[in-house]
């Protein structure tokens, strides 16, 4: 295994270089702006390439030493991609809504996860002794908990690294990571504050193809870390070396 390859052309074809309207920018992003076109800021991909490569190395290194990566993206166009990419790389995710205290009040979150497990046991069994209405209420409670916590139910503690799409929307998650000293890898669009992020990646954080490309690369970097960890322990890598490729990557490579 090796870190995933990517090219400037793939970034261009995924629309990574398109920022927001110029009047919406954060002036702190000035060093990462190439220019503007039709009142849209153009992000300097010559800087994105090395910064993305650095972030991929950090993800791989974190997983290689047994660390956990938490994917965070709750906006509509990121939600499904975030979950799929985290699952494929045996990592964790929050893709519905960030609950305040999700990291800083882990004990309370752990209790909710225990409740989710208990509900699974009850409902996966015969659920004897419950009326139809009681069972329906339990199912609704489980569904609500699973939506909020399903992606972290097996995490076992706070993560060692967080990967975030849309730093403005996920500001609470970033604040909690900072308080706990958890490093953050994040996409920073032209309207973001790069100072908040340990490993920033300048790029569009709205286009589905761009989000799919980032998530695919981060996922494959995590899988590379798993392979390195297993290799160092002498275990057979088995099927983990076979990784499905996101359509965005395939299309970009073929284009």
UniProtKB/Swiss-Prot annotation:
SUPFAM superfamilies from the UniProt entry: Ribosomal protein S2 (SSF52313)
Keywords: Ribonucleoprotein, Ribosomal protein
Pfam families: Ribosomal_S2
Gene: rpsB
Similarity field: Belongs to the universal ribosomal protein uS2 family.
GO process annotations (BP): translation
Protein name stated in the entry: Small ribosomal subunit protein uS2
InterPro entries listed in its UniProt record: Ribosomal_uS2 (IPR001865), Ribosomal_uS2_bac/mit/plastid (IPR005706), Ribosomal_uS2_CS (IPR018130), Ribosomal_uS2_flav_dom_sf (IPR023591)
Any one Gene Ontology cellular component term annotated for this protein: cytosolic small ribosomal subunit
Domain of life of the source: Bacteria
HAMAP family in the cross-refs: Ribosomal_uS2_B
Region (Disordered) residue spans: 230-255
GO molecular function: structural constituent of ribosome
Gene source species: Rhizobium johnstonii (strain DSM 114642 / LMG 32736 / 3841) (Rhizobium leguminosarum bv. viciae)
